[in-house]
Amino acid sequence: MRKTALSLSRLWFAGALLLAALSVPAGVRPAEAGRGNDELVLVEREIACNTDPAFYPGSNHYVKNGAAELLFKVDPQGVVQPSLAEGIEQADPHTWRIRLRPEGRFWSGKSINAESVVASLERSRRTNVRAAPFLEGLSFRSLDNWTVEVTTKRENLSVPLSLSYMELCIINADAPHTSVETMDMSGMYRVVSFEPKKRMVLERNPNYYGEKPIIGRIVHEEISDAETRVLAILSGRADIVMHIPPEHMAQFDGRKDVVLHTTPPASTETVYLNLSRPQLRDVRVRQALSWGLNRGELVLLGAEGRSFPVTTWLGSNPRYRDSGGGIYDHYDPERAGALLDEAGWKLEKDGLRRRDGVVLSMRLMTWGPGKAVGEAIQHQWTKLGVAAEVRHGDYSLIQTARETGDWDALIEGWQTFGDEFALLSGQFAPKGTANYGGYDDAETNALLEELSNAGTEAARRELSMKVDARVAERAPCIFLYPRPEGVATRADLKGYVDHFRKFENAINAQLHFE
């Protein structure tokens, strides 16, 4: 029966792939090996749903496919570099001045001057909810045609880092952006046709001010099913496929025609704990749940061995890989058991821990690719004497549970690279948007206040690591590993640059086929 089911599954996916190929409209042919540098097919889990980049899933897809540009971009080493901007200098603790490229032009030919940059950023502030937090506390004005002055509410805020966020692409704010004909961006490729949530075709922008791309046309397609995405690259139909989950990576082992890129992203797979639950109010219980996890085993079972353990939230950020300081640096079920004993949760003959007749229980909610790691956590917590349960389902179930407060633990992964104060306060300040469990710790809050006023990069780093360590010690969350996700490229495609920020990085001017 297993072989029959597998065969039927393969037939179904093969059929889906064939239907996808047949659905390509006139003028857009599937990728073919050895076709030269005329066309590249980029496939990912989802693409833009609107010609206006303010609409979800946002402008990162336009940055990824070469249509849109950011003022600054983070390179693979984690260093912020000028992109559409020519440079930047800090005038005082609250003031920065961005120099623009006089040669910069939108697709329409309109100059990308200081007024147009300010207008674009203010449009993002008004219309893009994902961009707004990165513009909070920033004000913009044009000093002259090619200089934008940025004033910050916080001292020594890293403006280049904030403006490198993937939702802050610079567009012509005077254009309607309601159709392919009216959208006006600045990238090396220009959108020529668009089927929302299906396919976008882009052609080389002949008037691009920067380095001209080698490949003439990009076909950007959405394939939501992971197995069908894998088949797209293995069959040669696609040239770059994003979002390869760990459970499918073994299919690339030994392949000579495909390269799998697995640079860990700056995103930490995290177990968020609901601190309003009676059993989780005691820090000793939370610490025990963390000491009682074998993270090495979780990496094998939940990430197919394609990641590495971390014990702090910033541990997935390449700038903070040394964060941790010995916190939960090994699997220690004995220590976990001792902490639970100390907290009054005694192990009884049936293998469960009780206090005052109440069983120590945990209900863990997972979604998407989190089922395997959730079940592994359930097994490890059960060995501690916890009555652990996993509920796997659609993400909407987690959202509903958070709104009602009816949850013990849930798994999510957030980006960890960016302005440290914005990121850490969003996760661990009392009113942080991702502080799901209601963590409110006086020492953490004081450290965050110091971080908000840190005057140097060295001070920001030191304080960020202190916040990170304090949070890990108090254990409102349990940190597991960088969430792995692969990118597959054809072996004859050269010039692809793997990046820990995969959301906005795929197409570059140097890509070419050999």
Model-derived regions: residue spans:
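A structural "hinge/loop" feature
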Residues: R45-Y62, L84-A85, K110, S158-L168, ...
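Surface-exposed binding/hinge segments that line
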Residues: E89, P93, A132-D174
